[in-house]
Design a protein with these regions (language model features):
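Alpha/beta enzyme core
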Residues: 1-34, 38, 44-190
């Protein structure tokens, strides 16, 4: 199976809003025609994707990012964005974990975020992914945050739901010092 991702805003792509919508439509159409499993798009494009997929009678799934790319919004803001994405037709919710709060020792906030957002996603039969942004963390923090997510899931959900929850390494948007790889590239992980 292939997934495909387009997460650029119009400004990031150097396009007008209308031009970026056309690019997104082309991206969605290609995924439909090539029978990809899932597309990953920004939340404001989920309705457009759902409409195109439904009209094409396609099985293409829609993933979207929540609190992207920094992950520093409040729990209430994360939940509101996720609820809207679910209502708009998203199948996969990729939450950016508040890794800065974790680094600053606010583990309880991160636990609550992981538990509450995962509950929302799983209750709505969605795949839930937690992006931890490894370029912003040292090796010890990567292990600790990944373990924290695992422990929250294992302690609070039935085993049959475990395959619906993932940890992802990177948004691909993290700005590193000296232009070093940000975790979303082969050189960063080899």
């Amino acid at each position: 199976y292939l997934d495909s991702t387009y997460l650029k805003t119009a400004a990031q792509a150097g396009l007008s809003v209308d031009e970026n919508i056309l690019v997104t439509k082309g991206f969605i159409q290609e995924a439909i025609e090539e029978r990809f499993k899932l597309i990953m798009i920004r939340p404001d494009m989920v309705c457009l994707a759902k409409k195109m997929i439904t009209e094409a009678n396609s099985t293409l799934q829609i993933g979207t990012v929540i609190d992207f790319p920094q992950g520093e919004s409040s729990l209430e803001e994360k939940l509101a964005e996720a609820i809207q994405a679910i209502q708009d037709g998203a199948d996969d919710l990729d939450f950016v974990c508040n890794y800065e709060a974790f680094k600053n020792g606010n583990v309880d906030l991160v636990k609550e975020e992981i538990l509450t957002c995962t509950q929302l996603g799983l209750a709505n039969k969605k795949v839930v992914k937690w992006i931890i942004e490894i370029a912003a963390l040292n090796d010890k923090q990567i292990i600790q945050l990944s373990s924290l997510i695992k422990n929250v899931i294992v302690s609070n959900f039935e085993q049959e739901l475990f395959p619906k929850v993932f940890v992802k390494s990177s948004t691909g948007f993290y700005k590193t010092e000296n232009n070093l790889p940000n975790g979303a590239t082969i050189p960063a992980i080899t």
